[in-house]
Amino acid sequence: MPEKSKYGRFGTGAPLGMGRWGFIAPELAQFAYALFTVLFILFTWTGLDNPQSLLWERMSMLSGTIALWLVYQLWPCRFVMACRVGYLLMMLGMWYPDTYELNKQFGSFDHIVAAWDQHIFGCQPALLFSQIHNSKIVSELMYLGYFSYYLFFIVTTYVIFFLDYRQLERVTYMIFGGFFACYVIFALFPVTGPQYYYLAVGMDEIAAGNLPDIGHHFASTQECLTPPGWQDGVGYQLCHMMHQAGERPTAAFPSSHVAIATLVMLIVARMRMWKYLIFLALPYLFLCLATVYIMAHYAIDSIAGLFTGLALFLLFGGLKLQKV
């Protein structure tokens, strides 16, 4: 009888590499998303700036996955598996801004989402939050909370790797499946977020509740507002560094930060890793608040992210990976 997992209700798990030809489930999720984007590119070829380059980028990214898979066939050990998963994590930094290249041909739907905020709250929470709570302490808590996003999916992946290796494939499948599900939404429903939309419309217009359709404005510009808060703070500087590295006018609805963090919290709770769950609790709270505070998201984006994370958990958590 197989040994029971120390942390679990995910069952005992199975040896890693149970997918077809030895690919692990998160790699298969990446292949599926890559196929979606290839078909997307082919069907929208004339609306894209450089479709040939986009196809080449996919070949390059997937070739790294295949190369590490080949190494694992020759040297099947945990170190190489850690590299395979690490490469997938690194490639998220490529897939995320790539959604901008796919969706900018459609124009922005910010006016719709901002109108939802206006209708529900009677104001623009992203505009007022940082104005009302403008102390250095609040600013640092918000930015450190926002930066803790990487704690949720990167650190958690390797916590599982070291504490419960047998669960690694299933957990990473859920996390990467969650990311790619969000990226599909981003490609089909472009929303840039307040930091871009507010600047394009004008702060006075936003404050007055005027939320016009700006069409394809962001197809030719990536200019955004300077994020609010204490600019000399460590958290602010960390987030600014990440923003400069890969932020684009895309991926606001739903908030993938909230969706993935919620998904991870549910995974950790289901695995009964209570100490780790308590450790994540405050960063999770500040992360959810920070998405609106720093003007990365409308309030409705974060609310939608919460429900998206729950839906992803119910979807992927109920699936059992089968040995092929």
Which stretches of residues belong to each language-model region?
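N-terminal transmembrane-helix/juxtamembrane module of multi-pass inner/ER membrane proteins
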Residues: P2-S60, F79-F153
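Aromatic-anchored segments of alpha-helical transmembrane domains
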Residues: L35-T44, M91-Y96, F179-A187, L282-Y293
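Membrane-interface helix-boundary motifs at transmembrane edges
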Residues: L48-Q52, Y72-R84, I160-V171, R272-W274
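Central hydrophobic cores of alpha-helical transmembrane segments in multi-pass inner-membrane proteins
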Residues: S60-Q73
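Interfacial segments of alpha-helical transmembrane regions
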Residues: A82-Y87, I154-P190, Q195-A208
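Membrane-interfacial catalytic/cofactor-binding modules of polytopic membrane enzymes
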Residues: L188-R270
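Membrane-embedded catalytic cores of phosphoryl/pyrophosphoryl-handling enzymes
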Residues: D232-V324
